[in-house]
């Protein structure tokens, strides 16, 4: 007897439905996308109990005639494409012709639709993939689809659904993302017979964001745009003070489609690097219009993931666009003081020496020297200029082209509108210091609090970055031997130029080992060896921006070690010098780790606390 059998059509449909219909939210997504593709201006979504017993999506799109209404439930029946050539220039959200057939295979579906100008509409009822009713009906132009009893005939799938409240959350997430993708469409969302929201459909994405996320996100938005012959970008990003523990507030849209893409995420991360704390993520609403032939959306059943034909170009455009906007906006966070509390109820956060002070080992003598030189700057010496820089090695050509985007942008800084912090803190009056850690200054109706370590760290970070091509190295007292795996040794030789740029000079030493002859001057021997090993590990990952990250991490660490610390007492001259240097930095608002350098408190806020004004 044969062991291999051809499956019947009913079983095939159920298997295929499993790829398209994971849960009720998948159904809502497919139906809304069909409505958008139909040219709808108004879409209504109604669900009950997480969409398991009932989903309804209605629209005022082009509608269908009787023949199309029946064909729509056939597998791979679509109006979006006609041949395989169309797959290379997809301009619609749907194109496979699987959605309705897959949905109908695992539920009870009722479709009512009418074309413009038709006297009557068409009603089609499908149960478990089989058409059980087809009649004429009276209905408005467009399409209305009701889906009942999801997975009624696949109990194994149904038992893996979450509770209704969780499934409702997934649906709300889908509707939210689709609202953001098409601000020109008015969406009405009703959950368990309660209206959740209505969007205006006026085409203004800021209005949609305000409606969905409230004023906190809306008021924090920075707008940036970029346009070339075949690429158009609009990015709305929250200021650095608005950040989250995950990427849930990052929305990427390419040609109207919500997508996930590592290149876009990497570009956002790199642009915000040093502006927000580590492992925190900004709010970003990114809209891209690009020639459909330059992307591939047909790589995943849900069409969530896409590929760009030129990932590097996309990274560069997104990175520069966001970075430009960060330079143009005032990023000083304003302290919000709750009016209900009086001064005796407000808890003042304390910072212990253990939390704030970086401890130095005996191998960090070079770092201590750099720090002490800060005190001598007022005698005519500039610590971080020629005396601390080696002449550029003639053997060093331009850094690996993975760094090109970052460095090209660094060279363009002068063309970007500089921050206005210099104006804000010019003619200030130094009030004093607090806890030997914070500097308090006053100007007009605002007083500012500056973290002295974060400020100096930012200054040094930008100085070291500008000197990166001439970074100082030193010969080690005792040669440092590093044992490597055979493939790692090959990688080290392949990336020798990059490692030289990072301050490491080495040569092969026996089997699967190298010997470090020179290391960055700012590092002690134990740190230099461990950092070299960490760098080799990261080089194994060929992500687009890793080499940029290696450069960043090295410089950030050096700046942190050399900066003045919390509990260091600074003289008035030193404070003035710190301010002069801070005013000319590219980003005076955060330290390289993304913590705030400066915060502002207004006179009005203080007067409200003391009830001078109500």
UniProtKB/Swiss-Prot annotation:
Protein role: This protein is involved in the repair of mismatches in DNA. It is required for dam-dependent methyl-directed DNA mismatch repair. May act as a 'molecular matchmaker', a protein that promotes the formation of a stable complex between two or more DNA-binding proteins in an ATP-dependent manner without itself being part of a final effector complex.
GO CC, one annotated term: mismatch repair complex
Keyword DNA repair applies: yes
Entries under Pfam families matching the protein: DNA_mis_repair (PF01119), HATPase_c_3 (PF13589), MutL_C (PF08676)
Keywords: DNA damage, DNA repair
Keyword DNA repair: yes
Tree of life domain: Bacteria
Protein name: DNA mismatch repair protein MutL
NCBIfam families in UniProt: mutl
GO MF annotation terms: ATP binding; ATP hydrolysis activity; ATP-dependent DNA damage sensor activity; mismatched DNA binding
Any one of the GO BP annotations: mismatch repair
PANTHER family linked: DNA MISMATCH REPAIR PROTEIN MLH, PMS, MUTL, DNA MISMATCH REPAIR PROTEIN MLH1
Family, as annotated: Belongs to the DNA mismatch repair MutL/HexB family.
SUPFAM superfamilies from the UniProt entry: ATPase domain of HSP90 chaperone/DNA topoisomerase II/histidine kinase (SSF55874), DNA mismatch repair protein MutL (SSF118116), Ribosomal protein S5 domain 2-like (SSF54211)
Organism: Thermoanaerobacter pseudethanolicus (strain ATCC 33223 / 39E) (Clostridium thermohydrosulfuricum)
Gene3D superfamilies found in the cross-reference section: 3.30.230.10, Histidine kinase-like ATPase, C-terminal domain, MutL, C-terminal domain, dimerisation subdomain, MutL, C-terminal domain, regulatory subdomain
